[in-house]
Amino acid sequence: MLCTGETVTGAMRRDCKAVFGARVIDRYTCEEAGWLALQCPKHEHLHVFTSNTLIEIVDAQGIACPVGMPGRVLVTALHSHAMPLIRY
């Protein structure tokens, strides 16, 4: 099962596995840039599609956040030449 847009709790994952017999995989997307990251099959972390996307996590001033600190997501799409998305 592929989940997009909402947090899926551990209990929801277990229920989906029990009912449907399927593993739940998270993806991170936006309509304008498409798929940005997909959950790793080995752990719960997401891997960014670095071949076509640059993702930055920044604070309210636009400064890069330290690893693990929450912040705003800025996306630069590296594949869209007709309508570039830069720090969107």
Question: Model segments located where?
Answer:
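Active-site glycine/GP-rich loop and adjacent strand/helix microenvironment
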Residues: 1-88
